[in-house]
Regions:
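SAM cofactor-binding core of SAM-dependent methyltransferases
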Residues: 69-142
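Short, charged/polar micro-motifs that form catalytic or ligand-binding hotspots
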Residues: 65, 83, 87, 179-183
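Short, charged, surface-exposed secondary-structure boundary motifs
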Residues: 113-122, 141-144, 214-219, 235-239
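Membrane-proximal basic amphipathic "stem/tether" segments
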Residues: 1-66
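S-adenosyl-L-methionine
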Residues: 119-173
Length: 258
């Protein structure tokens, strides 16, 4: 039986678990009703329909990511060269990683979608070198966006855990040379990755939708924008990163789920 969400003062030290460790969807979730949702959500009938499909239908996981043509070509050509791969936001990109047999870790805020990705990989490949990490940021809608967007104390704690999710109980041997930022909290995820890879000489961070988002420019303070592949930005390490400054920026952008 799934336990109710923890109260503000009882949040566990970590809020990330492997997708394979998640309990089955309980019958109680069928009790999910209108009384539990705020009016702002009730006004969105499409969201109610999405939540139902999210829980009771089998999502179709694509074989390739939904990048534009240039981004897709770059990602597809770069993956076979990677030794260790990290991504924020699972989906077709995870399938590409599994096919490449690269060691990988994927983080997602939608447990139902993440479970479907893992099941597809297990079914098609039997096993993988992957680690599937679910980070609970609260109930989510399409693309793993939090439904409840007001930054309450409890939500802030949860949101700040998302960029840190792949680094909790970190295996020192897991130092990715290729990182895709295509989930939530993209600036904070990029900056957190840069911080943890400070001593790594060579790596690439790919940030999708970069060309459309002026707020993502903060990343350029801490990494070199090497090229644009369509709407995808390719970053490489700077020679020096001021950790105090990057910590302050992470604190700020950990509350921005875009």
């Amino acid at each position: 039986m799934r336990h109710p969400p923890p109260t503000r003062d009882k949040l566990p030290a970590t809020n990330t678990i492997r997708a394979s460790d998640m309990p089955p969807i309980p019958d109680e979730i069928k009790q999910f009703g209108r009384a539990h949702l705020p009016r702002s959500v009730l006004d969105k009938g499409h969201l109610i329909a999405f939540l139902y499909r999210q829980r009771f239908s089998k999502p179709r996981i694509p074989d390739t990511p939904s990048f534009d043509d240039e981004g897709d070509r770059y990602f597809s050509s770069r993956m076979p060269k990677a030794r260790i791969y990290l991504e924020y936001g699972s989906g077709g990109s995870t399938i590409v990683a599994a096919k490449s047999r690269v060691r990988f870790k994927t983080v997602d805020s939608d447990p139902f979608f993440l479970r479907a990705v893992e099941n597809k990989i297990t079914t098609e490949f039997g096993s993988s070198n992957g680690d599937f990490v679910y980070c609970n940021i609260g109930m989510t809608e399409l693309w793993g966006v939090p439904i409840f967007k007001r930054p309450s104390a409890t939500r802030c704690i949860r949101w700040k855990r998302y960029p840190l999710a792949p680094w909790v109980n970190h295996d020192a041997s897991f130092l990715p040379d290729l990182v895709l930022i295509d989930g939530r909290f993209r600036v904070a995820c990029a900056l957190t990755t840069i911080k943890y890879l400070t001593n790594k000489v060579s790596f690439e961070i790919l940030v999708d939708d970069y060309g459309d988002r002026a707020e993502y420019r903060e990343i350029e303070e801490y990494a070199e924008l090497s090229s644009m592949q369509g709407r995808m930005a390719v970053f490489k390490p700077k020679s020096a990163v001021h950790l105090d400054a990057i910590d302050r920026a992470i604190e700020t952008y950990s509350l921005d789920y875009h």
